[in-house]
Design a protein with these regions (language model features):
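Carbohydrate-binding surfaces of carbohydrate-active enzymes
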Residues: 1-352
């Protein structure tokens, strides 16, 4: 299932985005299907998903040495996609690489433009009892596949919200600038904590501080009622309780919010309602079967748009960006030109 799960792919690029790393690299399309069953279309589909997840540098791991005298198909790498001259698709491989080069010329420029920091509540995983001697945290492990974080990540993605994951340690390095939550690499509109039962004292204290300085911090399916850890000082336990008791929530539709200094803490069982409360807009193109990733550049914004549906799309597509002009570039052919566009209630509609 390599390259087929967007949520799993986004874990590593999230770190690159929040930490200000220019490249997020992936060993890509190593094992898509059985030997000689994968084609370049399968590879492109996998690469597009990596690009949507924030990967902007790739390498292949299927080109191994094979002596000239070795009988066909030559020496093979044990994984199933073979990028070497004995594969019938070798002559066309260059066209895929031209496509990749063109896409990455944009995705390696500028900075990420995501709105939501999705907190990975590792303390809940650590608190689970079980007979497994070693925990794994790869994208396809049950710690991700069965987590409340994944539930929120899928909901955010399906509804067109742009997000990155963030850990406790990374969250402690954030600060507030103009009501935006700023990491070393990017700025975000909100932090989403998803159905966490336990949370480190320092993390909760930081979330409260961010709200106090003007941020909107949102909690999906409740706020943690207990601190993480085995040895907790009475002073910290008392302060943790004081922080929670000080929250005076008032219902506003499907959301309950409490003012904290210049900002607010909000709770709801509806992620869309929480995003609306945090003034986070969605990319409505997802409703048409398109997916995208945005980046900020010196001259505006880049969109990498992928048609994930099984139909051809020729229609007006809304962008969650107000623009004076728009250009289209087809990375497969290299053809570019100005796009037909119109403004619609603060957003830009582009004809694709």
């Amino acid at each position: 299932i390599e390259g087929r799960d967007l949520v799993s792919i986004k874990a590593a690029p999230s770190v690159a985005h929040t930490e200000g790393k220019k490249l997020s690299s992936s060993e890509s399309a190593t094992w898509l299907d059985e030997h000689f069953q994968s084609n370049l279309g399968d590879v492109k589909k996998a690469l597009d998903l990596f690009f949507l997840g924030g990967v902007n540098h790739i390498f292949y791991h299927g080109t191994c040495f094979s002596p000239q005298e070795a009988p066909w198909p030559g020496w093979l790498f044990y994984a199933a996609v073979h990028f070497h001259p004995n594969n019938p698709f070798w002559e066309d491989f260059k066209y895929l690489n031209q496509y990749v080069t063109r896409v990455l010329s944009f995705l390696q420029d500028g900075t990420p433009d995501n709105d939501v920091l999705l907190y990975y509540n590792i303390a809940d995983v650590m608190s689970e009892q079980g007979n497994r001697s070693l925990q794994h945290f790869s994208g396809l492990d049950r710690n991700m596949l069965e987590s409340s974080v994944r539930e929120s990540a899928v909901t955010l993605t399906e509804n067109g919200y742009a997000w990155d994951m963030i850990s406790d340690k990374q969250l402690l390095k954030t600060n507030i600038e103009k009501e935006m939550i700023v990491t070393p690499g990017a700025a975000y509109k909100t932090v989403l904590v998803s159905a966490a039962q336990y949370i480190p004292y320092e993390t909760m204290e930081k979330l409260m501080a961010l709200a106090d300085e003007g941020a909107t911090v949102v909690f999906y399916k409740g706020i943690p009622q207990d601190m993480a850890g085995m040895i907790l000082s009475e002073e910290k336990q008392a302060h943790f309780k004081e922080m929670l008791d000080a929250l005076d929530f008032h219902a506003e539709g499907a959301v309950k919010c409490a003012r904290v200094g210049k900002g607010k803490i909000c709770l709801s069982d509806d992620i869309n309602a929480l995003m609306n409360e945090a003034n986070v807009g969605a990319e409505k193109m997802y409703q048409a079967g398109l997916q995208c990733i945005r980046r900020n550049s010196a001259t505006g914004k880049y969109y990498f748009i992928e048609n994930s549906s099984d139909r051809k799309i020729e229609d007006w597509i809304p962008l969650r960006t107000e623009a004076r002009s728009a250009a289209l570039f087809n990375p497969m052919t290299g053809v570019s030109g100005l796009a037909a566009m119109k403004r619609n209630d603060g957003q830009t509609d582009v004809y694709l």
